[in-house]
Amino acid sequence: MAKLGVNIDHVATIRQARGGVEPDPVAAAAIAEFAGADGITVHLREDRRHIQDRDLRLLRQTVKTKLNLEMAATDEMVGIALSVKPDMCTLVPERRQELTTEGGLDVRVGMQALADAIGRLQDGGIVVSLFIDPDADQVKASSKVGADYIEIHTGTFAEAREWKKEQAELERIENAIKLGTKLGLGINAGHGLNYTNVRKVAALGGIEEFNIGHSIISRAVFTGLDRAVRDMVDLVKYA
């Protein structure tokens, strides 16, 4: 049975739009856990556009399930992670001009630097995942640099508007799951998943945890966060 990690970045996005103190992502995390989330995910970006350092430190004190920190593999972020000690760090690519993470890491570029960052985090007792496209070369490279997990980027699947394209992406995801499992990697997935499409990916099997944020926060505007999380839990766990 797959788990659900709720990404609460966009609670902070709303807060930062007015430069105030609400809505509070720490309170959102508590509600999400109460509603059945298996973990909380936040992305501390280098430009601090939504989640702030203070949020991360408070979440480490309050999250009762699992805290997953998405971050770039920079010296600054590795240092913060080693100080805060999230349960997992998911290393992601990051560009200042992007609205959201647009694709997976190219693990093959700068493998030694990435391996060094992974080693430092693991030496600090932190499980490390790499956010990658469903590509065999990226899966193999993730294993070579010593990652514990991969998180498969499902954005291309989610954006597919034709049945043939969707099926092709599902096949790529399934192949990445099988290869990652064969190589001893844990498998997570996320990006662009919503209440309409998540079951198609969950039905493939082999995915330990889905990290979903935008669609849950969007639904929460109309239904409340508790209901939005419970609805997604049902889809992920009982696909």
From Swiss-Prot:
Superkingdom of the source species: Bacteria
Localization annotation: Cytoplasm
Metabolic or biological pathway, per its Swiss-Prot or TrEMBL entry: Cofactor biosynthesis; pyridoxine 5'-phosphate biosynthesis; pyridoxine 5'-phosphate from D-erythrose 4-phosphate: step 5/5
Example of a GO biological process term: pyridoxine biosynthetic process
Binding positions for 1-deoxy-D-xylulose 5-phosphate per the UniProt entry: 9-10, 45, 50, 100
Catalytic activity: 3-amino-2-oxopropyl phosphate + 1-deoxy-D-xylulose 5-phosphate = pyridoxine 5'-phosphate + phosphate + 2 H2O + H(+)
InterPro entries: Aldolase_TIM, PyrdxlP_synth_PdxJ, Pyridoxine-5'_phos_synth
Secretion signal span: none
Site label Transition state stabilizer, positions: 151
Residues the record marks as active site: 43 (proton acceptor), 70 (proton acceptor), 191 (proton donor)
Annotated TM spans: none
GO cellular component: cytosol
EC number(s) recorded for this UniProt protein: 2.6.99.2
GO MF terms, alphabetically ordered: pyridoxine 5'-phosphate synthase activity
Role description: Catalyzes the complicated ring closure reaction between the two acyclic compounds 1-deoxy-D-xylulose-5-phosphate (DXP) and 3-amino-2-oxopropyl phosphate (1-amino-acetone-3-phosphate or AAP) to form pyridoxine 5'-phosphate (PNP) and inorganic phosphate.
Name under which the protein is recorded: Pyridoxine 5'-phosphate synthase
Organism of origin: Geobacter sulfurreducens (strain ATCC 51573 / DSM 12127 / PCA)
GN (gene name): pdxJ
